[in-house]
A protein has these predicted regions:
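HAD-like aspartate-dependent phosphatase fold
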Residues: 1-144
Length: 144
């Protein structure tokens, strides 16, 4: 079992133990969903399985998707349109207002999330999107 599957397994187990209605999944754009293009013109070359898996996650009632990006607002609008073309929607962008600060945790500058999908978190987009798709399809089959 690879790292991303372990992270989802752990998050879903905690969800059940704690009685939460959903988990929060933070997702980066560059070098995670799309291959980074260091030019002014974006190429929108997605990693294999990325868009298909994100569409599945969009439909999953137990997952709240948070887009995590440093993209400028005008470029972000282009990305959101591109995601919409693939029927992918993010519930939040760069934040999570559903989880307030507590006595122990301050979420003013770092949003609360259960699983992070980012190449800088160790996510391997060349392999992990496919593994994640099969994992999530298995969960959906169990719910039937």
């Amino acid at each position: 079992m690879n790292g991303i599957i372990r992270a989802f397994d752990s998050a879903f187990m905690r969800k059940e133990e704690q009685g939460w209605e959903k988990i929060y999944v933070l997702v980066d754009i560059h070098d995670t969903i799309f291959k980074a293009c260091y030019e002014n013109e974006e190429t929108y070359e997605a990693y294999p399985w990325a868009l298909t898996t994100l569409r599945l996650m969009t439909q999953h009632k137990d997952i709240c998707l948070i887009l995590w990006t440093s993209t400028y607002p005008e470029k972000l609008d282009e990305y959101l349109k591109k995601f919409a073309e693939y029927r992918i929607s993010f519930d939040m962008i760069n934040g999570n207002p559903e989880v307030p600060n507590t006595e122990l945790s301050c979420f003013d500058h770092k949003p609360y999330f259960n699983v992070g999908i980012d190449d800088r978190f160790g996510f391997n987009p060349e392999e992990d999107w496919r593994s994640l798709w099969f994992y999530l399809v298995g969960i959906k089959e169990e719910e039937k």
